[in-house]
């Protein structure tokens, strides 16, 4: 990422990939926490493209025990629209910063981005692998499947968005501490570069990020997408997210990680997902998210 590249902020207020209302308010909460002014203070050209239009939530259906893939038609609609917006951003030579919404929106964003690169790398900063397939998913929640879909396995209509699948060997998972059985097997079968919380405890976040950067460079990637799920952070510090897992990354560790990623100039696009202000405390999680994004784009104390 160059320092002069303009940024498109694109909201994707989807709540359909999981079961807790409120994550659709994530883009609003993040903007309210000062994202735009924070980035403009860094002398960046910032274009807020607003939110894509998403289907209305049918409360009765949303809370029902749906069989199979939950809210599938709505998720197709959201990701088709987001795919077009993100693709247009790249065609205009801008850096797409996508605000979720739940993590199912990464299908639309990353599939759009991958069309414009020959060998895209992906950093998945998350407590979860999001590598389930419908047949193995314990919940049917599609926010647990986007990365598997992006590698070329999953529901037909979502796969159709993805004409240039992500190679498993171009993926780095950071912050893992909750993986389903099928996800663990997929990671082992494809030898996906993975840093669990145990690895981070042993190595430290500095070495983890430096190893990530060197690994992706060795893969000769021509772009890297950063998908940052705030549930990667420990919920005792960062409570406003729907799939909390204790023992996560600290805010300080994440701050330093994003500082190192900024210095690498490797990242060409970004998602920020799973901020849910309805289960937050005084918009604290959105404020942390804004601070992390500011760090990623070059904000420093001195």
UniProtKB/Swiss-Prot annotation:
EC id: 3.5.3.1
Annotated GO CC locations: cytoplasm
Residues holding Mn(2+) 2: 126, 128, 229, 231
Gene Ontology terms describing biological process: arginine catabolic process to ornithine; urea cycle
Pathway note: Nitrogen metabolism; urea cycle; L-ornithine and urea from L-arginine: step 1/1
Cofactor: how and how many bound: Binds 2 manganese ions per subunit.
Chain sites annotated for binding substrate: 128-132, 139-141, 180, 243, 274
Domain of life: Bacteria
Keyword match Hydrolase: yes
Binding site residues for Mn(2+) 1: 103, 126, 130, 229
Record-linked SUPFAM superfamilies: Arginase/deacetylase
TM region positions: none
Pfam families in alphabetical order: Arginase (PF00491)
Name of the protein this chain belongs to: Arginase
Species whose genome carries this gene: Staphylococcus aureus (strain COL)
């Amino acid at each position: 990422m160059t320092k002069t590249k303009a940024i498109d902020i694109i909201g994707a207020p989807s709540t359909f990939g999981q079961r807790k209302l409120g994550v659709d308010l994530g883009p609003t909460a993040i903007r309210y926490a000062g994202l735009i002014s924070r980035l403009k203070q860094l002398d960046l050209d910032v274009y807020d493209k607003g939110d894509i239009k998403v289907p209305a939530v049918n409360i009765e259906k949303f809370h029902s025990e749906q069989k199979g893939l939950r809210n599938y038609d709505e998720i197709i609609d959201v990701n088709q629209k987001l795919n077009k917006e993100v693709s247009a951003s790249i065609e205009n030579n801008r850096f797409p910063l996508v605000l979720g919404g739940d993590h199912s929106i990464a299908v639309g964003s990353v599939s759009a981005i991958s069309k414009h690169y020959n060998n895209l790398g992906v950093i998945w900063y998350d407590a979860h692998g999001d590598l389930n397939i419908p047949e193995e998913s314990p919940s049917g929640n599609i926010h647990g499947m986007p990365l598997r879909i992006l590698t070329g396995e999953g529901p037909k209509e979502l796969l159709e968005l993805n004409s240039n699948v992500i190679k498993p060997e171009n993926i780095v998972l950071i912050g893992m501490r909750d993986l389903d059985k099928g996800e663990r097997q997929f990671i082992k079968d494809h030898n996906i570069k993975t840093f669990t919380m145990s690895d981070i405890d042993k190595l430290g976040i500095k070495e983890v990020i430096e190893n990530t950067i060197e690994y992706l460079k060795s893969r000769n990637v021509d772009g890297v997408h950063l998908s940052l799920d705030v549930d990667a952070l420990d919920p005792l510090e960062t409570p406003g997210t729907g799939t909390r897992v204790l023992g996560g990354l600290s805010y300080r560790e994440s701050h330093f990680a994003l500082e190192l990623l900024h210095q690498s100039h490797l990242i060409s696009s970004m998602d920020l997902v799973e901020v849910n202000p309805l289960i937050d405390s005084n918009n604290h999680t959105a404020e942390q998210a804004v601070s992390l994004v500011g760090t990623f784009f070059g904000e420093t104390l001195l």
